Design a protein with these regions (language model features):
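Residue-level recognition of single "structural anchor" positions
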Residues: 1-292
C-alpha cells in the first residue's frame, strides 16, 4: 500500500512534517536561538528536533491539529488519507473501525480536519466573473419538541431548517456558508464579503436579491416560479448542482447532521469541489494545509 510505504510509522510522519515546515534537507534549519542556520538531530524521547549547537528544540507538530494529541501521528495521517480517497467523505463510525480508535476520537479527528484544514470561508481571494448565488435549506422532520401552539390552541409542527448560502464562479471556485437567517441584509453582507463588485451575478427571483445591480456589475435573474430554469446565460444550475451533491452525500454517508456542526460538512464538500480539477492529490493538499 502506497500510504504505508511512505508513512510506515510515527517517525516517518514526524520526519515529513519536519522537512515540510523547517528543514528541506532534513538536517539543517533556522535556529531561533542562534539566529542562523544550524544542524539539528531528532530527540529520541519526544517528538522534536534539537539544535546541535545550543540545544534549542523545534517541534514539527506545534501550531497544527496534531499538537499535544494523544492519537498517534500515523493515525492522523491515515485519517486524512481515508478522507481524501472518497467523493462523499467518511463517517466517524467507519473511521472508528478503520483506525481502531473510539467513536469520540474518530469524530473529533474528522471535525478538526473539516474545520481546520478544509475551511476556506475565510479565504481572502474573492470570487469574480460570472457568479451564481443561491440558498438552500438543510434540516429534517421536526421532533416532538419542535411544536408551536396556534391562536386557537391547535398544536402545529414547525420546520426548523437552516439556510446555507452558495456562491460559485462558473468554471471556478465556490464559497458556501451556513447562515443564522436568510434575511436580505445577511445574504447581501456575505455576498459583498466574498464577491468582487466587477462580477455579474445570477440568482433566482427571490426578493432577497433585489437591488444587487446597484453594487455589482450586473444582476440577471431566472424565474423559477414560471418554471423557467435556463434562459440563455441566465441560470443557477451550477450552484444548485453543488447543493444536490452536498445533500445526497450527507444523506448517504452521514445520514443526518446537526445544525451546530453543519458548517464543517459544508466546508468538506466545498473543499472537494474547489479541487475537482486539481493535479495535486487531495491527500497531498490536506497534508500541505496541515503543515502550513
Amino acid at each position: 500500500m502506497e500510504f504505508m510505504r511512505e508513512f510506515s510509522d510515527d517517525a516517518a510522519c514526524l520526519d515529513w512534517l519536519w522537512r515540510s515546515r523547517f528543514s528541506k534537507d532534513g538536517h539543517t534549519a533556522e535556529c531561533p536561538k542562534c539566529e542562523r542556520s544550524r544542524r539539528f538531530h531528532r530527540v529520541a524521547s519526544r517528538p522534536s528536533y534539537s539544535c546541535d549547537t545550543c540545544g534549542h528544540h523545534l517541534h514539527p507538530t506545534a501550531g497544527t491539529i496534531f499538537h499535544k494529541s494523544s492519537t498517534s501521528l500515523q493515525l492522523w495521517f491515515y485519517a486524512m488519507f481515508l478522507m481524501s480517497q472518497t467523493r462523499c467523505g467518511i463517517s466517524a463510525k467507519q473511521l472508528e473501525r478503520e483506525l481502531g480508535v473510539t467513536y469520540k476520537t474518530a469524530w473529533r479527528m474528522l471535525n478538526l480536519i473539516r474545520n481546520q484544514l478544509m475551511d476556506e470561508t475565510g479565504d481572502g481571494e474573492p470570487l469574480d466573473g460570472d457568479v451564481e448565488v443561491d440558498e438552500t435549506y438543510y434540516g429534517g422532520r421536526p421532533r416532538a419538541y419542535e411544536t408551536r401552539t396556534s391562536g386557537r390552541g391547535r398544536v402545529r409542527r414547525t420546520w426548523e431548517k437552516t439556510p446555507v448560502l452558495g456562491m460559485v464562479e462558473r468554471g471556478g471556485r465556490i464559497k458556501a456558508e451556513v447562515l443564522p437567517n436568510a434575511g436580505g441584509a445577511t445574504i447581501k453582507g456575505r455576498m459583498h464579503h466574498h464577491i468582487l463588485p466587477s462580477s455579474m451575478i445570477f440568482t433566482d427571483e427571490l426578493w432577497t436579491y433585489n437591488g444587487l445591480e446597484k453594487t455589482f456589475k450586473g444582476h440577471r435573474r431566472i424565474k423559477h416560479s414560471a418554471r423557467v430554469y435556463v434562459d440563455g446565460e441566465s441560470h443557477t444550475q451550477t450552484v444548485e448542482g453543488f447543493f444536490g451533491l452536498f445533500k445526497n452525500g450527507v444523506r448517504g454517508t452521514y445520514h443526518a447532521v446537526s445544525t451546530k456542526w453543519l458548517q464543517g460538512y459544508v466546508n468538506e464538500y466545498a473543499w472537494r469541489y474547489n479541487r475537482r480539477n486539481a493535479r495535486q492529490s487531495h491527500f497531498a493538499a490536506l497534508l500541505a494545509q496541515a503543515a502550513a
